Amino acid sequence: MLLADVVRTSNQVSVMSSRNAKVSLIADLLHRCALLVADGAVPAAEIGLATRYLAGSLRQRRTGIELSTLSRLPAPAVGGDVTLFDLDAVMQRASEMAGAGSSRARAELFLGLVRRLSAEERAFVLGLLRGGLRQGALESVVMTAVADAGGAPLDDVRRAVASQGDLPGVSQALLVDGPGVLVLFRLTVGRGVSPMLASSAKSLAEALAKTGPAAVEWKLDGIRAQIHKQGNDIRVL
């Protein structure tokens, strides 16, 4: 799938105020991506990439591309020929570079991609890199769109994502294999669970009614972590 298709949908979503309209636009794009996969035109992994990019994140946690590189960009191109895989491949190669000269190599690699991007595509990619993509499509909106595109109950999608912490993976599986695949997503030792915050209550009385007797302490600064143990293997997530 072309990056331009995702960027166009993102830009349309960014000017929409209606949540339902945003969901509909994203679901339509994911459905079109699934049709391309079914026809053998693109690999199934592009569904996951489209989902991830519309939710505002890259697959690579760190690319190593320095922000200073982003201030020396060539003029925008006509664009329209860069695919989702093209973008992911550049980011993956950048993330794997190390050693002497790697910063310069990353910059050259990234600039090679940028020279092929239109102004709209460039703004989208820079937003992903900076982690500040403003398009009005929070993960909850994208998750609802995934459920709509895949014809699955939203609660089933939420449960699958919560157990695996992987919305793109759930999206790809659902749109390729159908709603029945969601039962395969279960809690797995060593894999982080998404919801790390307790659900809210309207009042203290309501909270205590749900939990029963409780001890309450002042909240201290610290970190929130999950500890997974399987035999002698212990992971802190």
Task: Place the predicted regions along the sequence by residue.
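N-terminal nucleic-acid-engaging modules of covalent nucleotidyltransferase systems
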Residues: 1-237
